[in-house]
Amino acid sequence: MNLDLLGWSDFFTHSFVPYRQQGFSVGRVAIEYRNTYIVYSKQGELAAKVTGKLRHQATQPQDFPAVGDWVIIQTRESEGCATIHGILPRKSKFSRKTVGSKTEEQIVAANVDTVFLVCGLDGDFNPRRIERYLILAWESGANPVIVLNKADLCNSLDECISEVEAVAIGVPILVLSATNNQGIDTLKAYLQPGQTVALLGSSGVGKSTITNQLKGASVQAVQPVRQGDDRGRHTTTNRELILLPTGGLIVDTPGMREIQIWAGDESLQETFADIETLAPECRFRNCQHHNEPGCAVQQALLEGELDYSRFLGYQKLQKELNYLVRKQEQRAQLAQKERWKKIHKAMRNHHQY
């Protein structure tokens, strides 16, 4: 396989130099299973596992390879397998908080150039969900593109596009109907040789259908959505990096029923640029935009310049991010405490001998 077509660039070359001198090879993670990875490399497709050392040193989920990662490998070509010794620095990473009570980062896709945020123009259409995806996209370091699928099922297309334009300020918006192959060509501009695009969206929005149309074959199984709620049945069960005939790469991901935010203030500001632009005009620097006198945001709401549901979405996400920061700080303090416990224990054991 050609590394350049797999997304290799100068960004990774410099980091790999010392490993090349030691005789290691490099590959890109295509599929992630529980304890095994499928890696694309010069030697072809390889089944790979991480070394015991890498597993021992990993303290959190993001220390393990994710789909899209460039990894340092030692190959056993006769067996068609490899051992993963490390991960090269990530150019970008699309992450969310793990589902459940744990405050941990889950990397959905790494080293992505563009993120297609796919939304169905049927019962799935939800501008608030788009806002949540946008925050994660801006945080990732990749460029977001809104893909509105199922245009053939929408009776108010112009109205839906206007709603998206209001929440995705300055973000490209593409409209298509994947099942009819209408508008698919508009996606190809982002899938030049060596470019990686991640498809993200809830189940049933047509991500696998889009992948199949771009691939020109049914590489991903497709199932109909349920009648009544327009929800899909999680056609894609594993994240997978797929090499397209054009030379571009696409990461198809399972539908996300729960979008847990993992981001910082800058991504919130980028997503809600209209509200952030109003904030400096408030009378008080620390204005919370509730009932304070001279609040420019509240004035914009009264005059109809700012949509109230968008403002409520902003407040909700702001609270989520503040809560996440507090949980991260608590987790860091606990980790530091555990670290010092281990150091003191090691020192006591040393003095005993």
UniProtKB/Swiss-Prot annotation:
* Gene3D superfamilies to which the protein is assigned, alphabetical: P-loop containing nucleotide triphosphate hydrolases, Probable gtpase engc, domain 3
- Determine the domain of life of the protein's source: Bacteria
What family, per the record?
Belongs to the TRAFAC class YlqF/YawG GTPase family. RsgA subfamily.
**Ligand binding (GTP):** 149-152, 201-209
Q: Which cofactor does it need?
A: Zn(2+)
Q: Which GO terms describe its molecular function?
A: GTP binding; GTPase activity; metal ion binding; rRNA binding
How is this protein organized at the quaternary level?
Monomer. Associates with 30S ribosomal subunit, binds 16S rRNA.
Cite the entry's keywords alphabetically.
Answer: Cytoplasm, GTP-binding, Hydrolase, Metal-binding, Nucleotide-binding, Plasmid, Ribosome biogenesis, RNA-binding, rRNA-binding, Zinc
- Write down the HAMAP family for this protein, in alphabetical order: GTPase_RsgA
One Pfam family matching this protein: RsgA_GTPase
NCBIfam families with a match to the protein in the record: ribosome small subunit-dependent GTPase A
Q: Name one GO biological process term.
A: ribosomal small subunit biogenesis
> According to its UniProt entry, what is the function of this protein?
One of several proteins that assist in the late maturation steps of the functional core of the 30S ribosomal subunit. Helps release RbfA from mature subunits. May play a role in the assembly of ribosomal proteins into the subunit. Circularly permuted GTPase that catalyzes slow GTP hydrolysis, GTPase activity is stimulated by the 30S ribosomal subunit.
One GO cellular component term: cytoplasm
Task: Fetch the InterPro entries from UniProt.
Answer: G_CP_dom, NA-bd_OB-fold, P-loop_NTPase, Ribosome_biogen_GTPase_RsgA, RsgA_GTPase_dom
Q: What is this protein called?
A: Small ribosomal subunit biogenesis GTPase RsgA 2
